[in-house]
Curated annotation (Swiss-Prot):
Name this polypeptide is given: Peptide deformylase
Gene name as annotated: def
Originating species: Syntrophomonas wolfei subsp. wolfei (strain DSM 2245B / Goettingen)
Record-linked PANTHER family: PEPTIDE DEFORMYLASE
Ligand binding (Fe cation): C88, H130, H134
Coiled-coil blocks: none
Cystine pairs: none
Length: 152
C-alpha cells in the first residue's frame, strides 16, 4: 500500500465539506488501506480522507484496540462532556484543550457496505468526533478553549 503525505494547514481542502461515498468499490477500498498505512506511519490515532487530499466522507481510527474504518460516518447522538488535550496530524506542533461529548452514538458503513451503529465513550468518542469534524471542514483549533505550541 501507499503512505501519503498528510496535508497541513492552511490548505483549503481541510476547510471544505467532504462528499458522501456513493459506491464502495476497489478505489474506495484502496483509499481506506492507504489511509490506514498513512495513519500508522504518522503515529496517529485517526485520519480523515481530506487529510490526504481526498474530499470524501471516510475515516480510519485506531486507539490501540482495533482498526475502525468508517464510510459516511454520522454522529447520531451525544451525551456528557469531556475536556481534554488534542493534537492533529494536519496542525503540527499545536495542542489544544477541546470540550467534546463523553459518549457518542455513531452510524456508518464498513468496507463491506454493512451498516454499523455503535456507542463510543471517552477516548474513542473524542477521536471519532475529531475525525468526523474533519469531514465538515472543522479543525480542533476551531473548537479549542486554548492552544499552545508543543516543542517537537
Amino acid at each position: 500500500m501507499s503512505v501519503y503525505q498528510v496535508i497541513t494547514v492552511p490548505n483549503d481542502i481541510l476547510r471544505g465539506k467532504a462528499l458522501p461515498v456513493k459506491e464502495i468499490n476497489a478505489g474506495v477500498l484502496r483509499v481506506l488501506d492507504n489511509m490506514r498505512d498513512t495513519m500508522y506511519a504518522a503515529d496517529g490515532v485517526g485520519l480523515a480522507a481530506p487529510q490526504i487530499g481526498i474530499p470524501k466522507r471516510m475515516i480510519v481510527v485506531d486507539i490501540g484496540e482495533n482498526l475502525l474504518e468508517l464510510i459516511n460516518p454520522e454522529i447520531l447522538k451525544q451525551e456528557g462532556n469531556q475536556l481534554g488535550s488534542e493534537g492533529c496530524l494536519s496542525v503540527p506542533g499545536i495542542v489544544g484543550r477541546v470540550n467534546r461529548a463523553k459518549k457518542v452514538l455513531v452510524k456508518g458503513l464498513d468496507r463491506n457496505g454493512q451498516e454499523l451503529n455503535f456507542a463510543a465513550v471517552d477516548l474513542l468518542a473524542k477521536v471519532l468526533q475529531h475525525e468526523i469534524d474533519h469531514l465538515e471542514g472543522i479543525l480542533f483549533i476551531d473548537k479549542a478553549i486554548e492552544t499552545r505550541i508543543e516543542k517537537l
